């Protein structure tokens, strides 16, 4: 009986090499200027002749001229070069490790001579190779060869096909994917130090001086001991080989751990992790906390040491990285496109950018306009200053939201952690002091004690959102004190003494001491946070849930609309999507506003007044927060953030007024609760007072009636936190009462009896 057989379709590698050579030498693309993407070329004038350029031959020429050391082979180019030949593309994706070597061999064969004079003193390997060539001129030809890995001055990587390809999650990887080129999405949880990895080991004989090379392709190898040269064999000398470190070739190596995202984990499961190996030029391309798509070759690796004895036939798996794509890029790395720049210019021309951006933050959450404005300033941030003596003044803004349950504090925190390029969300009960700062761990690769960053380190140059801030243990909460002002974390444990950067903004949410706010107890006792911590927050919002027929009705309508239509109610403008908000903030953060002399004097007077108000509140037992010199810095930081939103390099008095208004509004609900007479002041009367004060500020010129334009009133009223509807209702109400008069089609407003209302 004949044994069953199967027909394995083994690719013809010689034929594949011919196709690869043809692709590398003949693939051309339209010429792209520096800083532009390929897709932007289609926007050029239709009448221009496209200038085609050989893409990969140019890359090889740069490598030959020592101007580059990376070849990125985009498999989209291979598909575009010959769409009918899908077999080669399939072979590469299913057996990528073998085709890396084939592409490298073809690149070696096509490597052009340098077109510029090369200085061989740049690298140690160049000097050694030059000496080897001179030495081998008189040696037998069979001993003149060098391993290809030794002579290659480049790293070759594949970029996967992007069309109709959905990234894998870690738990979706199967045995059938081994050896394949694939893309995995996850969050980076740990990165090791970059270490040299041996790829070609060089030995020198102590008897005859013969040089032997050994290519290393696995974790472990057996070093050569006896010289294989003919001279030693003839003389029966058995020369001993010694490793020559400077003549060997090392590649930078970094091990990275990625973990599944929250939305990839099934119900009741815990996130899985995957080890990723980075070699060569792509090391240091990811940081802990980054959400990335990593493309690479999924490979098995046997366990070593004692773990091999326990594992038996089991093997571990890892991903050999070829390409890294950041899902959410940092503000400095966001690529500007003509479309995004045009959208930003259109947004600026429309006016009220501050209002539109604030309303675009969590639009499905009703109200909280002033809270959203403060969160917008948190995203933009102030200007970090470094003085000549090394002193550093932080520019990041810290905000604390405290108040009754059910006012959407946690939802706002969740949204900010997602819209920020680097956002970490954690809770007070689920976080320890070590989990927030740094923990000492044993590195599984080197077996050394290393530091692993916590939530605050992961949020470096980003935002750390801490929910249930009041429920943290006091010993854990003290770990945040240094971060909130000095923006560093000092570690001294397990023989490691160092300082880590934690240049992060803190956004905290807390409930009052008794669950709900108790108006019979002083405000400072309701909050139950130490004064040293409260003073580090630039602005502290107290959000009380007080019954109000009008507000409750609007809130209920808003919530029911969201549940009916799965979207927020229609606004007078289209809310900006998070990506557009990131692009605008990225442009705004390029400005570094300065504070002129007149604004400095104005801020000084405002700060002195705040201190006087605090003294009065302490006497009346209405103290809400401590006014300290840090409050002065907070005003300046928020003013700088507002100037950045205007794309201005100067802070104006209006910016300081808005910062002071936000500080006042943050505790307005408290004063409304303490002062029952304040409930008698309606929204319309507040807006009327603003209009009256504006009219009083106009100088009285004999023969001219004092009037205001609707545009000026609208800008002032909206800046105070009111809406367009509030303004229209106020003007209509006071016009019906015979107090105001509108002219010029409603664009000009004046008082019917100016003298009477100037006195009131």
Swiss-Prot record:
Pfam families: HTH_MCM7, MCM, MCM_lid, MCM_N, MCM_OB. Disulfide bonds: none annotated. Its EC number is 3.6.4.12. It catalyses: ATP + H2O = ADP + phosphate + H(+). A motif (Arginine finger) lies at residues 535-538. InterPro entries: AAA+_ATPase, MCM, MCM7, MCM_CS, MCM_dom, MCM_lid, MCM_N, MCM_OB. Its main location: nucleus. It is an enzyme of class 3 (hydrolase). Keywords: ATP-binding, Cell cycle, DNA replication, DNA-binding, Helicase, Hydrolase, Nucleotide-binding, Nucleus. ATP 1 binds at residues 366, 406, 408-410, 511. Component of the mcm2-7 complex. The complex forms a toroidal hexameric ring with the proposed subunit order mcm2-mcm6-mcm4-mcm7-mcm3-mcm5. The heterodimers of mcm4/mcm6 and mcm3/mcm5 interact with mcm2 and mcm7. Interacts with sld3 and mcm10. Acts as a component of the MCM2-7 complex (MCM complex) which is the replicative helicase essential for 'once per cell cycle' DNA replication initiation and elongation in eukaryotic cells. Core component of CDC45-MCM-GINS (CMG) helicase, the molecular machine that unwinds template DNA during replication, and around which the replisome is built. This is DNA replication licensing factor mcm7. It comes from Schizosaccharomyces pombe (strain 972 / ATCC 24843) (Fission yeast). The lineage of its organism: Eukaryota, Fungi, Dikarya, Ascomycota, Taphrinomycotina.
